[in-house]
Amino acid sequence: MSLTIEKITLACTNISKMPEFYSKVFKADLKEHNFGDFKMYSAKLGNLRFLFCPNEIAGVDANQSRHQFDYIVENVNEVIEAGLASGGSIHSELQENDSELFVTLLDPDGNTINFIEKK
């Protein structure tokens, strides 16, 4: 059996804050979509399609950490600056070992995201 992830949908509490964060941190070109009275946003991050939709549409009752992904980046300090400048915060401080630098940020909804810079 072959399995490929085509799209990830993130249910968001603070949907209005998500575009700025993901545009700056991931350099994603988010597109706005209207679904009745709701706004949703979609983008391609790497080879994966993402859809950000309000909790009300998704019917999700979780308050934070509905997902966690690890991303390999070229410059982790650049990602930290972009995240802090666009509504994110640091969950765990920048750490370093022999092979990588890594940090965990929180997006505006409080979801943890790990960023890793390989040495």
Region spans (language model):
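Core segments of cupin and vicinal oxygen chelate
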Residues: S2, T9-F50
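A short beta-turn/loop motif at secondary-structure boundaries
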Residues: F35, V60, Q95-D98
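Short linear motifs in intrinsically disordered
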Residues: K27-N34, D70-Y71, S92-L94
